[in-house]
Amino acid sequence: LRLVDPVMGDGGEIYATYTPELCRAMGTLVDGADALMPNLTEASILTGRDYPGQDIDDAQVDEILGALLAAGAKNVVLKGIDRGDGMIRNYVASASTGVAGKQELAHAKLPFMTHGTGDAFASALCGAVMAGRPLAEAANIAGEFVRHAMESTQYQPNHEERGVSFELNLDELTALTRR
């Protein structure tokens, strides 16, 4: 099982630690990935497209998903679409059904950002897949886990500097994967 979380950038910016060479190397991991989990910045880098911003329509989602599937990913979870309606959307598509079979997963957006949510999402998704959940269900479980972890985190001192405190919600993740 090869799950690829690119961790290359966010908000339209490449992380300072990433070089063009590392971006190209990450692109080689797309081909054959059982599940590729980029945010919109990472998807833009991997497909060689301009960053479209967080508010993209269904046609743009289909274009990006199609390009990532065409690059060889077996399944794609495109994360973090924010259309300004209080929801964060993730989209799941597979090479077997193409973009026509994509699934939209929406979670309530919280009024703050914290670091580490992408890592927590990828880890929770991996755990749910390993527990036998189909990818779309695993992505939904991961999204709910991250949202609940962020809700717990907001009550911790200096939470914006510390990052997501997911440990308080691990019991919930275990319960979600057993349902």
Predicted regions and their residues:
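Phosphate-handling active-site elements
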Residues: 99-104, 128-142
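Short pre-catalytic strand/loop immediately N-terminal to key active-site residues, enriched for Gly-Thr
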Residues: 101-116
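Glycine-rich beta-alpha junction loops
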Residues: 8-10, 42, 80-83, 108-111, ...
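Rossmann-like NAD(P)(H) cofactor-binding subdomain of soluble oxidoreductases
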Residues: 6, 10-18
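Short, small-residue alpha-helix embedded
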Residues: 45, 112-135
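Conserved phosphate/ATP/ADP-binding segment of small-molecule kinases
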Residues: 16-101
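Short beta-strand/loop segments at the ligand-binding rim of alpha/beta enzyme cores
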Residues: 1-2
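Charged C-terminal helix
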Residues: 136-179
